[in-house]
Amino acid sequence: MYALLLGGLSTAYAQTGITPEVLKTLQGSYTGTPAEKAMRNAISNVGISKMAVNQENAGAKDKNFSIEVKNTGITDQKSSGRCWLFTGLNVLRGRAMKKLDTKNLVLSQCHLFFYDQLEKSNLFLQGVIDTRKQPIDSEMVRWLFQHPLSDGGTYTGVADLATKYGVIPADIMPETYVSNSTSEFCGHLKRKLREFGITLREKSEAGMGEKQLQALKVEQLGTVYRMLVMAYGVPPTRFTWKGKTYTPQEFFKAYCINEGEDLNRDYVMLMNDPSRPYNKVYEIDYDRHVYDGHNWLYVNLPIEELEEIAIASLKDSCQMYFSCDVGKFLDRNVGFADINNYDYGSLLGTTFGMNKKQRIETFDSGSTHAMTLMAVDLDDAGKARKWKVENSWGADSGQNGYIIMTDEWFREYMFRVVVNRRYCPASVLELMKQKPVRLPAWDPMFQNEE
């Protein structure tokens, strides 16, 4: 019976595999015309993107903006995935610079990243404890061990971490070699966390109770803390800066937020995700940095409404945390994002016709990078023509560290923007009262900005 089954499968595979006859048909799709040979030679020697540059769109770019928030200076995340942290701190430092009346201030990314990695380690280990009764091949447990932690993140991480641990100037806890190049150390930390996770599951299976597991977790976190100190340094509990002594929390409350302000409560994450119904609130499980913090919660809006809210914020000189699929159709040399920058279809003799909804559903596009939205250029009707963001790839990238994007590109590849509630119309604030639709951690929209 087994042999018959295998025989049946082999026949089915033979009918659907690439047979010699099918291969011969496929080979006929390339005829080797002089034009095809020339194109093949050019692509193989120069590369796709250089060959696909659309010369009809390669002229001078308009760099003028009708509304632009004063910049705070370009930072550089180097070889790390911390764009979310640089972006969030860039927004906060703009406020601090105004209150301190200074043009020279950078907030320490290394300080908050230390606690980010510590909190994410606890998030993973506690997740292992919470799911210890589930089989190790269950979807949730498998996801946990696949994603023990990363250096990427979202706005909620900035909000939770800054609120809990405060912020400090960068010269108090400067960058290290490891913070500028996180991949190797993160790999070692992930391996150690997986080892700790397996130990927790084995101890649970052997009869260890909740209280003892929590004690073991704290012991494991002690090892994590020591590893983090070796890589990033010791976070100060008090520091002296320009003649005054602060705790990180005191500095944060004094200069980065207004009295009574809450970075979670007072801000709304807006999303344009056409793969899901609009005017609903969504929450992604485990999309947070702190176990007792906030999941990523967003209201899904049509792009037209989202743009109106973003414009209102910029008109009031308020920058925003913004994220997008930055790599699509971006000319990195000039810092210009335009869907007409490259003509890949003509080059390769085909078309690329998926819309935004289809790209999300098939994992072809998603939010990959966070930047600070700081400018918009409006036409006579008050509609956006182009946008400008402050990036964190250093001053030598793009337009002296900035990226300009056409509104057409913005609509196709922009995903998230975080705005103060005061810029949202009453209809959007009413939507936020809904019970969120809970999405699993492995949803296509679970993607950290890096």
Located regions from the model:
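Papain-like cysteine protease catalytic cores
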Residues: 109-239
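Bacterial Sec-dependent N-terminal signal peptides
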Residues: 1-17
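Active-site signature of cysteine proteases
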Residues: 17, 207-450
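Stable alpha-helical elements in mature extracytoplasmic
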Residues: 79, 87-88, 92, 154-163, ...
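Structural recognition of the beta-strand scaffold that forms the well-ordered cores
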Residues: 85, 111-114, 160, 169-172, ...
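N-terminal regions that are enriched for targeting/export leaders
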Residues: 16-73
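Second-shell loop/turn segments in exported
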Residues: 69-81, 143-149, 292-300, 309-310, ...
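Post-signal peptide N-terminal segment of secreted/secretory-pathway proteins
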Residues: 59-62, 66-131
